[in-house]
Amino acid sequence: MARYIGATCRLCRREGMKLFLKGDRCYTDKCAFARRSYAPGQHGQGRKKLSNYGVQLREKQKARRIYGILEAQFRKYYEKAETMRGITGENLLKLLEMRLDNVVYKLGFGSSRAEARQLVTHGHFLVNGKKVDIISYQVSAGDVISVREKSRGTEKFKTFAENPKTLPAWLEGNIENFEGKVIAEPTRADIDVPVNETLIVELYSK
């Protein structure tokens, strides 16, 4: 699968805000954005006023970067969201939130979405008792996500279990048993990403 391999901190600087792509590092003074919050490049400190199209494009890019998705796949999510009942923008965010890599991250098994993606790819997780290593796998309400038995003894997963996260309302965690459950589909109020999905819909509707 194609993926972005450039400097992660440049993405935060490009969007003009912390996207928390490096997990715990983003909360320290080692964070590149804390030291240089202007855009990368020779003219980065002289930000120009964006056109309406530019604002819409930046919002879409921000969403892509938060969830670690390339353009072609992001477009497919949008097209699927259009066919679903309800509000297209909210449907789009719901599809992104219910990716397995994001759910693993939200459950606290990963300090960032990037780390969660890596752990899923390496086969550390089960969905309803079966190994799933596809990061884009769409979970459903009622699904149980658990850490494989042989992975639970590693220092990384012990650390996750000892430092549980506050979970969103649509997830339920059982850290002692290294598992979590999707108890409902997320509502817009449950999704805390700093994205204005209406701008993305406006961009793709042109």
From Swiss-Prot:
MF-aspect GO terms: rRNA binding; structural constituent of ribosome
Keyword check for Aminoacyl-tRNA synthetase: no
Any one GO CC term of the record: small ribosomal subunit
Alphabetized Gene3D superfamilies for the sequence: Ribosomal Protein S4 Delta 41, Chain A, domain 1 (1.10.1050.10), RNA-binding S4 domain (3.10.290.10)
Pfam families: Ribosomal_S4 (PF00163), S4 (PF01479)
Biological role: One of the primary rRNA binding proteins, it binds directly to 16S rRNA where it nucleates assembly of the body of the 30S subunit. With S5 and S12 plays an important role in translational accuracy.
Subunit details: Part of the 30S ribosomal subunit. Contacts protein S5. The interaction surface between S4 and S5 is involved in control of translational fidelity.
HAMAP family: Ribosomal_uS4_B (MF_01306_B)
Sequence similarity: Belongs to the universal ribosomal protein uS4 family.
Protein name in UniProt: Small ribosomal subunit protein uS4A
Organism: Clostridium novyi (strain NT)
Lineage: Bacteria, Bacillati, Bacillota, Clostridia, Eubacteriales
Gene: rpsD1
